Amino acid sequence: MATKGGREKIKLESTAGTGHFYTTSKNKKTMPEKMLIKKFDPKARKHVDYKEMKLK
């Protein structure tokens, strides 16, 4: 059985202020810095930056 614990669930929250977010996971060992990704925000109806936040 494979070992667990390498990946952590995160929330990508829109910087446009609409409150929209995506959830995903990332490997903390290979990518320790915070993610900043351009994705589509359906509430703003355009591509905006999404910042990594902690998933509660």
Curated annotation (Swiss-Prot):
Stretch forming the signal peptide: none
One GO CC annotation: cytosolic large ribosomal subunit
Biased composition (Polar residues): 15-25
One Pfam family linked to the record: Ribosomal_L33
SUPFAM superfamilies, per the entry: Zn-binding ribosomal proteins
Segments of this protein annotated with the region Disordered: 1-28
Keywords, in A-Z order: Ribonucleoprotein, Ribosomal protein
Protein name as it appears in the record: Large ribosomal subunit protein bL33
UniProt source species: Albidiferax ferrireducens (strain ATCC BAA-621 / DSM 15236 / T118) (Rhodoferax ferrireducens)
Encoding gene, per UniProt annotation: rpmG
